[in-house]
């Protein structure tokens, strides 16, 4: 078969419609017919249009024909995709409510459920006014209207004045509370010309806007949040406001408790606190140490369970939050078996959040310590929780009576090898003379000795702990057992 006129005549004579082995112009060893047609598309030129913009000749890669488009006439386009009866919805809603109250059960694939329909809301908290439930539209408007005046919050001027005074009182109480917490700085009274400072500035540590921004970053980036508590005072180092925030804003995130520094309390105290806190959240006892730790295997196993729950994710992030100096960075170092976070026996060592890789699918996030503001906490409580540095406290000797109240006499005698004091002042004087810490004229250095006692109290050299709350049905430990194990 050829490519000339004879081949064309033969195809017409025999009625052959196939191209045969006809070659495209430009086809050779380097370019096949498909490549040649593709290159000819660029050299064929653009489309040609007239002065009105109508297409006269289309380009080789254009098609002027418009396909007929239509929607398939199917009733499924206009029906419900999923239908559920009211009884089944109510049954599922009640089962879901019981599951959400149990912190040991996890709701998977939350995004595939209509949570706004399943979660029941209080009528009081609902944004709807529900006016028609109390009074019909016909009673207020129209020819049969019975109400002649609009209903106001106050029926007369006296009620309005009373409500206004209550609002002013609430506002003033809030102002006093903010001033007490040190959140508004020094409050100036221009009329009297004096400045009120209810609390030392050092006791507002851990409440700055920068610290709270770091906390929100950690919460937003974490799938699992670990709340680190001090085993000596778990309720005192618990951030309830943060828990309420997570319960309201991020209910899909997991929150667990880790009772750190359990080596500083007796075993029965740690066990009682774990039993008490486990009723609310999963709780683990932990002792942070790279060489000799406790609870490390249980914590890693729990994190692996959370990782297996979220198999649809490539990895999960675990954030550590809590009061300053509770051991968040030490727990991360214990899990990694080496020093990856900077640690110190003083609060405020961690400045910003930090990402650490634990394994292929689990990442850890370290967070600076935060102190939720509370009007119930005194300066003494804040100091004894290790929130502030003792060397920055003015007149530290005023907090020594609180140390003597929280510690047993035998523990102080065993620690400092002294005895025979009657009050805090005499205790400081005896200890100062024993250690030779005297000023000019043989006066004891009360400030220096008091700072030493407070540091020993916070760092665990003096044994102390808070007893767990007693519940009905629980046996109270015997006094002899408490004295023996303390």
Swiss-Prot record:
It is found in: Nucleus, Nucleolus. Residues 1-20 are annotated as: Disordered. The modification Phosphoserine is found at residues 60, 85, 155. SUPFAM superfamilies: P-loop containing nucleoside triphosphate hydrolases (SSF52540). GO terms for biological process: regulation of ribosomal subunit export from nucleus; ribosomal large subunit export from nucleus. Keywords: GTP-binding, Nucleotide-binding, Nucleus, Phosphoprotein, Ribosome biogenesis. PROSITE patterns: G_CP (PS51721). GTP binds at residues 322-329, 366-370. GO terms for molecular function: GTP binding; GTPase activity; large ribosomal subunit rRNA binding. Its main location: nucleus. GTPase that associates with pre-60S ribosomal subunits in the nucleolus and is required for their nuclear export and maturation. Present with 67700 molecules/cell in log phase SD medium. Belongs to the TRAFAC class YlqF/YawG GTPase family. NOG2 subfamily. This is Nucleolar GTP-binding protein 2.
């Amino acid at each position: 078969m050829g490519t000339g006129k004879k081949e064309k005549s033969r195809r017409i004579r025999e009625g052959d419609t196939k191209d045969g082995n006809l070659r495209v112009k430009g086809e050779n060893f380097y370019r096949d017919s498909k490549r040649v047609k593709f290159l000819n598309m660029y050299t064929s030129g653009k489309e040609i249009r007239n002065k009105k913009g109508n297409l006269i000749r289309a380009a080789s890669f254009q098609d002027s024909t418009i396909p007929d488009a239509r929607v398939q006439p199917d009733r499924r386009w206009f029906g419900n995709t999923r239908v559920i009866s009211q009884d089944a919805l109510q049954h599922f809603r009640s089962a879901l409510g019981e599951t959400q109250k149990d912190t040991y059960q996890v709701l998977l694939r939350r995004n595939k459920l209509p949570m706004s329909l399943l979660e029941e809301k209080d009528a009081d908290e609902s944004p709807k006014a529900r006016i028609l439930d109390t009074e019909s539209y016909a009673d207020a408007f129209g020819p049969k209207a019975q109400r002649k005046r609009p209903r106001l919050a106050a029926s007369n001027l006296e009620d309005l004045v009373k409500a206004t005074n209550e609002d002013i009182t609430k506002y003033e109480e809030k102002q006093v509370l903010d001033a007490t917490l040190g959140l508004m700085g020094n409050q100036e009274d221009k009329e009297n010309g004096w400045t009120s400072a209810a609390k030392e500035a050092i006791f507002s540590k851990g409440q700055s806007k920068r610290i709270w921004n770091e906390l929100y970053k950690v919460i937003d980036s974490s799938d699992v949040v670990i709340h680190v508590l001090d085993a000596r005072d778990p309720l005192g180092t618990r951030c309830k406001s943060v828990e309420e925030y997570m319960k309201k804003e991020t209910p899909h995130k997991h929150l667990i408790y880790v009772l750190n520094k359990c080596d500083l309390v007796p075993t029965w105290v740690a066990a009682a606190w774990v039993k008490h806190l486990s009723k609310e959240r999963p709780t683990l006892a932990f002792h942070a140490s790279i060489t000799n730790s406790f609870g490390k295997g249980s914590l890693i196993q729990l994190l692996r369970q959370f990782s297996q729950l979220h198999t649809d994710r490539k990895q999960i992030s675990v954030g550590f939050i809590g009061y300053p100096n509770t051991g968040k960075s030490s727990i991360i170092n214990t899990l990694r078996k080496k020093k990856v976070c900077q640690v110190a026996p003083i609060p405020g060592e961690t400045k910003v959040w930090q990402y650490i890789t634990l394994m292929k699918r689990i990442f850890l996030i370290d967070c600076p310590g935060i102190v939720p503001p509370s009007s119930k906490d005194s300066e003494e409580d804040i100091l004894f929780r290790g929130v502030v540095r003792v060397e920055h406290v003015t007149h530290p000797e005023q907090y020594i009576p609180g140390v003597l109240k929280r510690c047993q006499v035998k523990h102080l005698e065993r620690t400092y090898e002294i005895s025979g004091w009657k009050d805090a002042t005499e205790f400081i004087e005896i200890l100062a003379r024993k250690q030779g810490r005297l000023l000019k004229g043989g006066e004891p250095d009360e400030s220096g000795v008091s700072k030493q006692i407070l540091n020993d109290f916070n760092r665990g050299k003096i044994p102390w702990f808070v007893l767990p709350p007693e519940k009905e049905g629980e046996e109270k430990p015997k006094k002899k057992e408490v004295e023996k194990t303390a």
